[in-house]
Amino acid sequence: VLEIFPSEYIHIGGDEAVYTRWEKCPDCQALMKRLGLKKTSELQGYLTNVVAEMMKKKGRTLIGWDEIIQRGKVNEQVVALSWHNPKDTLRATNTGHKAILTPASHMYLDFPEMSIPGEIQAATWCPPISLEKCYSMPVNDYSETSTTIGVQACYWSDQFIHGNALQEFVPLNENRSENYAEYLLFPRLMAVSEVGWIKQSKRNWEDFRTRVGSHFARLDNKGCHYRLPQPRIVKEDKNADGSVTFTLACDVPGADIRYTTNGRYPNVHSTKYTGPVTLANREDLRAITVVSGTRYSLPLYFAPDYSAYKAYGQHVFGWEPLRVQPKPANWRFEVTGKVSGNGTYELTVIPTRGDNPVRLGTMKLWKRKELMAETKADKTVKAGQQPVTYRFTLDQFEAGTPFHIELEGYAPQGNNTTGMIFLRKVE
């Protein structure tokens, strides 16, 4: 490995190690006793020391995820990639190690910028990371003794593995893979650059947002498939008659805003924004940034308010009459990111409108094509009645892996029914 890679740093990974085999291994247990270790996880620190000493003899420095300095004492100075929490860099400084800031909450660019309709397929095990959130990443230690040496943005290719929507289709020559990567990386990579070069006290989001706009023409000139920002709400006024007046702004110089006021998705031929717009219902406004006939943003969009159902967890699915069949059929919906780890979950089905009852059958949880949990049932639920809840347990969670649920649901008496489904982790 050292012959192939002449770099100063050698990365050994070291994150999310599983210690169950070590707990059962007599040799590992004997080693723990000989070294006086109390926790099996401390064996990782022992192994890190062995490799770090090997690297030192070869004139190299060990680098790995922050677990390498959290699982037992490491004697040689190493570099820890802090991906859990920005404050973890303090641990590196206090224990004689170096650190690189790369928290998943701000620097994992395989997450989408938003979770609005039409957003690109991307990682979902953490919330979206907007351009502003990326730019606002906190840096906790600017002291003279700080050993934080920089920032790192991570871009994982899991989504290429998990679905065929991103695979190249040669006859079309779409260059999907590069376009996909550029869409997620730009303009957020510009934010990463400033986080690395400018002290947090001198960062100014409004100033940065304005300056980024001047770079879109450069990206266009380079053929970069960057993500266009949606129109921005500058002002929202509530009028005496209950209507709402919006004032919008565009962050892309030379671009237009096109909008609709009926809740439908706008296109490049929709009404051009020239001044404040008044609507009876704020949720009916949709607006897009238009650069050309083929380059436009996702819509400015008001997400539904599910706060009244907070006790049931996160919204994962909704049905309307056209989706409901008179005979048994499976409703399939993604729960990647909503399923956040091993444990027990409850899936709650709540009809909200309609005269007809819904018949519910078996629920199945899938990890890719592998069945993880199955709950059999034969229940009927109707608007105004108690919701139906399925309980299941997951013990083979895998971060970054897609999960989906199939639920048998139908309405033999007619499809006049509308409802929602929520998922929560209970233990």
Each PLM stretch: what is its role?
Residues V1-V78, W83-G96:
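Active-site neighborhood of glycoside hydrolase catalytic domains
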Residues D355-G361, N415-M420:
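Short coil-to-beta strand junction motifs in C2/discoidin
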Residues T348-D355, L407-G414:
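Short beta-strand-plus-loop segments that form exposed binding edges in beta-rich domains
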Residues A280-D284, N342-T344, G400-P402:
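Extracellular Ig-like/FN3 beta-sandwich strand-entry sites
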Residues D256-T260, G361-W366, M420-F422:
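Beta-strand signatures of extracellular beta-sandwich domains
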Residues L62-E67, V74-V78, H84-T245:
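Flexible, acidic glycine-rich loops studded with aromatic residues
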Residues R209-V316:
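Short, compositionally stereotyped local motifs that mark structural "simplifiers"
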Residues A308-V339, M372-T393:
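Extracellular carbohydrate recognition and processing domains
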